[in-house]
Amino acid sequence: MPHNPIRVVVGPANYFSHPGSFNHLHDFFTDEQLSRAVWIYGERAIAAAQTKLPPAFELPGVKHILFRGHCSESDVQQLAAESGDDRSVVIGVGGGALLDTAKALARRLGLPFVAVPTIAATCAAWTPLSVWYNDAGQALHYEIFDDANFMVLLEPEIILNAPQEYLLAGIGDTLAKWYEAVVLAPQPETLPLTVRLGINNAQAIRDVLLNSTEQALADQQNQQLTQSFCDVVDAIIAGGGMVGGLGDRFTRVAA
């Protein structure tokens, strides 16, 4: 029997993708815990999410951090110092680079991580990894964390209102996962079953995107929140991340 040990981390512990998803924060955290939250966000991201933010964002004691840097060691150290002591949860609001930084900060502080994606350009909200950069903004490597993200809160209307170029980027990135997986695992029958499940998921997601993208893009142009649009967004964020989670190094390159 061939031995190809892999680690499977399928996805976050909780994933909510529907209007009003932010309300689920209170299903898992008390007001006292949320008053000790660290919210980290980008300038455009927090503006995009502003009308959807839950009351927990304004609780006394909450730490708000506007971040403009990279997921670098120096930036994460600075954020950890700025966060202070006795924090309960890290909540990241933004795109892939911001969420990678917030994920790294949460692990540095030993806290659960909640992702609030404001664009659908990558599966960063789903995946338990961060891409690290140096201070000049050059990518160095990625780190897979020992635990899954605790929660993803996806508010579809925020994604609907984002520039369409981000959705197009996510569609292209996610379509590529099927083709990359075929190259990385040319003999899937010799690999663990979960790798094959990941490849099957990549194919299913590819089909969703090929069938629904045209309608989803038109719906976004018309500012209509439809099933086709939500399917494409979930295919990018949840589906794309799940492919890497199931197949590890055999499907991870696109995650």
Description of each model-found segment:
Residues F22, I46-A49, A97-A104, C123-W126, ...:
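Short glycine/serine/threonine-rich phosphate/pyrophosphate-binding segments
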Residues P19, G42-E43, V93-G95, V116-I119, ...:
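Fold-independent oxyanion-binding glycine-rich loops
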Residues K52-A56, L79, L105-R108, P128-V131:
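Short, glycine/charged-enriched secondary-structure capping and boundary segments
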Residues A37-V38, S88-I91, P112-V114, F150-V152, ...:
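Structural motif
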Residues S83-L105, L109-T118:
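A short, small-residue-rich loop immediately preceding and capping a beta-strand
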Residues R108-N201:
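A glycine/threonine-rich phosphate-anchoring loop and its flanking beta-alpha core
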Residues L191-A255:
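Active-site segments that bind and position negatively charged phosphate/pyrophosphate groups
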Residues M1-S88:
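ATP/NTP phosphate-donor binding region
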